[in-house]
A protein has these predicted regions:
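Charged, often glycine-rich, active-site loop that binds/positions anionic groups
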Residues: 116-132
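Acidic helix-start/capping segments at beta-turn-to-alpha-helix junctions
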Residues: 105-119
């Protein structure tokens, strides 16, 4: 399903979920994603097989225990090191799942990366930034089985999220909470 600009605006995301701090982008997304309705995510970590399939937002706020469990699934599996992930990233995934009518779990290829892990990846590939937002818990590389990664990247760009990177060859989309940019 390809969603046009009107569909994204209709979902309450016209402001862009990662607008400048002064504009209340996070609050706008929190209100626009689903109003007061509970927000659910279905996630599978590729490297570990671990899953999260639960509500992470209810009664008008984030569920701290659910966020803690999500942080663990998004951890750096090579070091078993976790960090608090930016919950706006979860809101983006939740919204994308709704707009794509997804029934399966997002597969997380990469979430948080410890600085050592990121440095090793950057040495091995020019495609890895030495100052990656993965190290701040503000980025994830994901795919959604049965959904085209190009369509996912296009939707994320229409949602005006921060960074959106399409890695066609690897079949995933990079999403982050940084400045708006596309590659």
């Amino acid at each position: 399903m390809v969603v046009g600009r009107r569909g994204v605006l209709g979902a309450g995301l016209g402001l862009g979920c990662f607008a400048a701090a002064g504009s209340g982008g996070a609050a706008a997304l929190a209100q626009g994603v689903a109003g007061g309705a509970p927000r659910r995510l279905s996630i599978q970590r590729v490297q570990t097989g671990e899953t999260f399939d639960d509500v992470y937002w209810k009664d008008g706020r984030y569920d701290r225990e659910a966020l803690r469990r999500l942080d663990w699934v998004f951890r750096d599996p090579s070091l078993d090191e976790a960090t608090p992930m930016d919950p706006r990233l979860f809101d983006v995934l939740h919204t994308m799942a709704r707009l794509l009518d997804a029934t399966g779990a997002f597969q997380v290829v990469s979430g948080y990366r410890a600085p050592e892990t990121n440095a090793a990846r950057a040495r091995a590939s020019r495609r890895v930034s030495r100052v990656s937002l993965h190290m701040s818990g503000m980025a994830a590389d994901v795919r959604l089985p049965g959904r085209d990664s190009t369509a996912m990247a296009r939707l994320a760009a229409e949602m005006q999220v921060g960074g959106v990177g399409l890695y066609r060859r690897d079949g995933f989309v990079h999403l982050d909470c940084g400045p708006a940019r596309r590659w």
